[in-house]
From Swiss-Prot:
This is Phosphatidylserine decarboxylase proenzyme. It comes from the Bacteria. The gene is psd. Catalyzes the formation of phosphatidylethanolamine (PtdEtn) from phosphatidylserine (PtdSer). Its main location: membrane. One of its GO terms (molecular function) is phosphatidylserine decarboxylase activity. It is found in: Cell membrane. Is synthesized initially as an inactive proenzyme. Formation of the active enzyme involves a self-maturation process in which the active site pyruvoyl group is generated from an internal serine residue via an autocatalytic post-translational modification. Two non-identical subunits are generated from the proenzyme in this reaction, and the pyruvate is formed at the N-terminus of the alpha chain, which is derived from the carboxyl end of the proenzyme. Pathway: Phospholipid metabolism; phosphatidylethanolamine biosynthesis; phosphatidylethanolamine from CDP-diacylglycerol: step 2/2. Binds 1 pyruvoyl group covalently per subunit. Belongs to the phosphatidylserine decarboxylase family. PSD-B subfamily. Prokaryotic type II sub-subfamily. InterPro entries: PS_Dcarbxylase, PSD-B, PSD_type2_pro. It is a peripheral membrane protein. It comes from Chlamydia trachomatis serovar L2b (strain UCH-1/proctitis).
Length: 301
């Protein structure tokens, strides 16, 4: 599939649209050439490269990149909490906050909402992940969570994946209300979660740097909330207070410059994902959603 043929479903319109691929030529070089694949592996395994790129994006000169970026990727700047001229660097804009009413939160204690802006895939059963085996190597939940006992709790459960593109709003939020534990970090590499890369290797989720937070709620039980770092994402920043009660839709943290992913894991018989998300995911199509929209409802027998 060509780099410019990545399709997704716009949830608000229900139409299939073409994703605006960033650096498609470079990605094709990394994927399709031997030299590119070797260079890509070296860069992703070297955290210094990611730190240098992140440092560069914090330079004041990068503020001149903001307006062309907004125009090219049709970012709605009216939603931002601050005007463009207030951002001191590109990274400052990248981690921008939105106006309080920019992302309405779907109400109801029995409703779990989307935790971030991004492209979503949902798996009502972990067995559905067989769609993403690469070279007959299945996705390993144990490797992903780094804890056999924790993995056992979700082995028969459900999973939702939100892939954030560089042009997305990069603050992530709580999908449910409950008690949020302190995050546990698993160190790893920073492979790209570019859609073309992800189609080639779903296992990057078990190899990349990530942080795991358990949220305990009455309706949804213990939900594992996992932030996965990606190429050029130097750090995952948590802004909530561990051990405290959190409200649905409250900010949890943000990703520094780059694109990244949020993964939600649910125990068995805890959530019924919305039918449209299930249907599109079964077709291999991501659904582009905004933070705060309905992801699914509490499972009731």
């Amino acid at each position: 599939m060509a780099a410019r043929e990545m399709l997704y479903v716009n949830r608000e319109t229900g139409k299939v649209e073409q994703e605006r691929i960033i650096c498609s030529s470079l990605v094709k070089f990394f994927i399709e050439t031997r030299i590119g694949r070797a260079l890509y592996s070296v860069l992703c395994k070297n955290s210094l490269f990611s730190r240098i790129v992140g440092w560069c994006q914090r330079l004041r000169v990068t503020r001149y990149f903001i307006k062309p970026f907004v125009t090219k990727y049709r970012i709605c700047i009216e939603e931002s909490a601050s005007p463009l001229h207030d951002y001191a660097s590109f990274n400052d804009f990248f981690v921008r906050k939105l106006k309080p009413d920019a992302r309405p939160i779907c109400q109801g204690e029995d409703i779990c909402v989307t935790p971030a802006d991004g492209a979503y895939l949902v798996f009502p059963s972990m067995a559905d992940l067989s769609l993403f085996t690469i070279k007959n190597k299945p996705f390993s939940l144990e490797s992903f969570l780094g804890d056999p006992q924790l993995a056992h709790q979700y082995a028969q459960g459900s999973m939702a994946i939100a892939r954030l593109a560089p042009f997305d709003y990069h603050r992530f939020h709580f999908p449910i209300a409950g008690i949020a534990e302190a995050p546990r970090r698993i160190n790893g590499h920073l492979f790209s979660i570019h859609p073309l890369m992800l189609k080639r290797n779903f296992e990057v989720f078990t190899e990349n740097k990530r942080e795991i937070t358990i949220i305990t709620s009455k309706e949804f039980g213990e939900v594992a909330y996992v932030e996965v770092g990606a190429l050029n994402v130097g750090s995952i920043h948590q802004t909530f207070s561990p051990g405290s009660y959190v409200k649905k839709g409250a900010e949890k943290g943000f990703f520094a410059f780059g694109g990244s992913t949020v993964v939600l894991l649910f125990q068995p018989q805890r959530i019924i994902f919305d039918a449209d998300l299930v249907g599109y995911s079964a077709q291999g199509l991501e659904t582009r959603c905004r933070m705060g929209q309905s992801l699914g409802k509490h499972f009731s027998s």
